């Protein structure tokens, strides 16, 4: 049987991995074995952190809303509950932007939330 080196396909596979490892330090960007390990780990982290990013932003928005609500003498849970009772359906991202960038509008919303809770 003739010896098969898998030339083109193997080279293409290795080059694909090394291309993904471009910019890594040291042997991780040059040696196929270490590059494979580094790329596999990086892809796992990327997948995990795409999910984590959504949770992180939600936490950030809630923190900002809570800070804005406390400046208006109402806590976060009563603020959100009051908005729900008043029928105002703004998501946390929009509310956080209002709390940071448009304080008068956020104050009006907190007044509405207080009235709905009363």
UniProtKB/Swiss-Prot annotation:
Task: Give the taxonomic lineage as stored in the record.
Answer: Bacteria, Pseudomonadati, Thermodesulfobacteriota, Desulfobulbia, Desulfobulbales
- What is the native source organism of this protein? Desulfotalea psychrophila (strain LSv54 / DSM 12343)
**One Gene Ontology term from the biological process aspect of the record:** translation
Q: Under the cellular component aspect of Gene Ontology, which terms does the record hold? A: ribonucleoprotein complex; ribosome
Gene for this chain = rplT
Q: What is this protein called?
A: Large ribosomal subunit protein bL20
The entry's function note states:
Binds directly to 23S ribosomal RNA and is necessary for the in vitro assembly process of the 50S ribosomal subunit. It is not involved in the protein synthesizing functions of that subunit.
HAMAP family on file: Ribosomal_bL20 (MF_00382)
A Pfam family that this protein carries is Ribosomal_L20
InterPro entries tied to this protein: Ribosomal_bL20, RIBOSOMAL_L20_CS, Ribosomal_protein_bL20_C
Its family remark reads: Belongs to the bacterial ribosomal protein bL20 family.
The cross-references to NCBIfam families, in alphabetical order and at most eight, read: rplT_bact
PANTHER family assigned to the protein according to its UniProt record, in alphabetical order: 39S RIBOSOMAL PROTEIN L20 (PTHR10986)
Give GO terms: molecular function aspect only: rRNA binding; structural constituent of ribosome
């Amino acid at each position: 049987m003739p010896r098969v080196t898998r030339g083109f396909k193997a080279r293409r596979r290795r080059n694909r991995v090394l291309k993904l490892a471009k910019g890594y330090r040291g042997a991780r960007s040059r040696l196929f074995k270490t590059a494979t390990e580094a790329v596999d780990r990086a892809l796992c982290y990327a997948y995990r952190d795409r999910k984590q990013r959504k949770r992180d932003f939600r936490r950030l928005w809630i923190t900002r809303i809570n800070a804005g609500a406390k400046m208006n003498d109402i806590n976060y849970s009563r603020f959100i509950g009051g908005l729900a009772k008043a029928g105002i359906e703004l998501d946390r991202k929009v509310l956080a932007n209002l709390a940071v960038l448009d304080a008068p509008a956020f104050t009006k919303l907190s007044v509405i939330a207080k009235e709905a809770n009363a």
